[in-house]
């Protein structure tokens, strides 16, 4: 019993700095007689470590009885688009390359083993941030991925 509490506590601590998505909207793709329809969901999140960068992710969400109960596994299909929405402030850790590949967003896409992740890279040569969206599993991930780049530009007032 102690181990369950320890694992749960560590999991919550590790997920703390990740961004939380806000659902912007969705469209139904397949009608289901029982349970919710299959759909494509559009969500937005702000990079938790880079002020004034917002990313939009679209992803498939499985419906039906299993989907309604949270037991279905969503497909690995996703798209991402990130934009500068104000003056960008980069920390020294990001500028020095110590945060390369850092997970900035994670969404569970199956009951236990699968998730959609977004990781950030900083391209110092081009002064740009690159955001990579991909799906992974405990045992095996998917090669499906999407990328969005945000050039770090001066913000006009």
Swiss-Prot record:
Alphabetical list of Pfam families matching this protein: CreA (PF05981)
Gene ablation phenotype (knockout): No crucial effects on activation of cre regulon gene expression during aerobic growth on glucose or pyruvate minimal medium or during anaerobic growth on glucose minimal medium.
InterPro entries: Uncharacterised_CreA
Any one GO cellular component localisation term in the record: cytosol
S-S bridge residues: none
Keyword Acyltransferase: no
Protein name: Protein CreA
Alphabetized UniProt keyword annotations: Signal
Native organism: Escherichia coli (strain K12)
